[in-house]
C-alpha cells in the first residue's frame, strides 16, 4: 500500500513539474522594434490623435497548453510619449495631463488570464498610471510562436483596451476626450 501511495505521489509530482516546466519566460523585444504601445484619443470630437510610447520594457510567461497560467508585466516611461507634434507632446506631458515629471512611469501587471477562444483571451491586471492603480482588462489575441532566423524562439500577441482618463485622475481636453484607446503589440524572445 505504501509503495502504491509513493508511486502515485511521485507520478503526480512528475506530472506537475512537467506542466510547470512548459511555461516559458519571454522578454519583450523592443530593441528590434517588434513591440509597440500605441494610443488614440479623440480631439474634441472632430478627429483622433494617434501616438505611441517609445520607451517601455516588459516580460511575459507563456504556456500554449495552459494560457490561463500566463502572466505579463510592462513598465513604460510616460515622458516617451510621441504624437508627431512636439508642442502637443509637451502639453500632454505637462501637469495639465500626464504630469510626467511627477509620474514618470506607468505599469501594468496581470492578475488573471481567461481564455475566450482558440487564440483570444481577456487579460486582467493592475494598471498604475498618474499615481492611481485600477483593474483593467485587455482583449488579447495570440498571433503565433516558433523559431526565428537567429536561433531563438518567439511568441507574439496584440491587446487592446479603452481607459477612462478620469479614473486615473487625468483631465482630458473636453468631454469627448475622456477615453483613451490603447493598442499593444508585443513580440517576446524566449529566455534561456
UniProtKB/Swiss-Prot annotation:
Q: Which Gene3D superfamilies match?
A: Lipid/polyisoprenoid-binding, YceI-like (2.40.128.110)
Q: Work out whether the entry's keyword set contains Signal.
A: yes
Show which residues constitute the signal peptide: 1-23
Q: Name one GO cellular component term.
A: periplasmic space
**Where are its TM segments located?**
none
Q: Does the keyword Signal apply?
A: yes
Listed A to Z, the keywords are: Periplasm, Signal
Query: What is the annotated localization of this protein?
Result: Periplasm
Question: InterPro entries in the record, alphabetically?
Answer: Lipid/polyisoprenoid-bd_YceI, TTHA0802/YceI-like_sf, UPF0312/YceI
At the top level, the lineage of the source is Bacteria
What family does the Swiss-Prot or TrEMBL record give for this protein? Belongs to the UPF0312 family. Type 1 subfamily.
PANTHER family, per database record = PROTEIN YCEI (PTHR34406:SF1)
Name of the featured protein? UPF0312 protein PputGB1_5030
